[in-house]
């Protein structure tokens, strides 16, 4: 067996946490030769529920799970961790705008950023899942300036998976045939799922799917609004699919990307594609297993440029609303 990875999961007793923890403990995130220690962070009121989840984890007798703890103390939960999965945030309810959440969540992510910088291992990497995840990530990162900016990620993999599923269904092919599907910008209803640069069975999507009006209309709208649709149908936000997105993101970061493919996550922009430097912006990415880089040189037509600008403008606006927290 290889090394042991220490993982902090915030909001661990919540619905996403509940779906996620068992997949981490079973080896689906870090692989079957890597032992894991899970350090759960929860609000004091949720500690009893978290202890129930710990009992269930113990009862699974996962060979890779070395230890699992829960605390409401940031310093304890983030001690010596290699990965921080920041799942917990004040949840979005039906009818609530994302803007309402910015200030509410800002204080949470200021404190978490500071505590991660103070307590985590020197190689720590952070994935923010709790919404609004791009700006929550921006706040945490700017309050942990001792941690290199290339260690911070916000999740857009769920959007990528949603988009792949829609394209596969429309084309009548298995979802694995859809590759190089980038999500640009914000994990919000302005995100741009880039079908122009994606492939189905190695061919451009626009060659395989002849209904270009669907691609430019319902496809994008379906991906952008999917989270809201699930809240409407289920009475609660995406949980198992979000947890799956977390597993997929971490695996994509730590595993070399297949030739000709890419994966989606939001990272601190280096100015690529004219984005404002330092914004947490969604890009198509490649990994060599250690370092992650932005896929360069992708073409944009006028339609794509307009979609790109809309999501970029929204992220600038979100950043401006939380400037005093950065």
Curated annotation (Swiss-Prot):
Positions of the catalytic residues: 187 (proton acceptor)
Which Enzyme Commission numbers does its entry carry? 1.1.1.37
Q: Indicate whether Transmembrane appears among the record's keywords.
A: no
Give an example GO biological process.
malate metabolic process
InterPro entries listed in its UniProt record:
L-lactate/malate_DH, Lactate/malate_DH_C, Lactate/malate_DH_N, Lactate_DH/Glyco_Ohase_4_C, Malate_DH_AS, Malate_DH_type2, NAD(P)-bd_dom_sf
Q: PROSITE patterns of this UniProt entry?
A: MDH
User: What terms describe the molecular function in GO for this protein?
Assistant: L-malate dehydrogenase (NAD+) activity
Keywords, comma-separated and alphabetical: NAD, Oxidoreductase, Tricarboxylic acid cycle
Residues involved in NAD(+) binding: 11-17, 105, 112, 129-131
Keyword Flavoprotein present in the record's keywords: the answer is: no
Instruction: List ligand-binding residues for substrate.
Output: 92, 98, 131, 162
Q: Which reaction does it catalyse?
A: (S)-malate + NAD(+) = oxaloacetate + NADH + H(+)
Question: What biological function has been recorded for the protein in this entry?
Answer: Catalyzes the reversible oxidation of malate to oxaloacetate.
Q: Which family does it belong to?
A: Belongs to the LDH/MDH superfamily. MDH type 2 family.
UniProt cross-references to PANTHER family, sorted A to Z: MALATE DEHYDROGENASE
Annotated protein name in UniProt? Malate dehydrogenase
Source species, please? Leptospira borgpetersenii serovar Hardjo-bovis (strain JB197)
Q: Which gene encodes it?
A: mdh
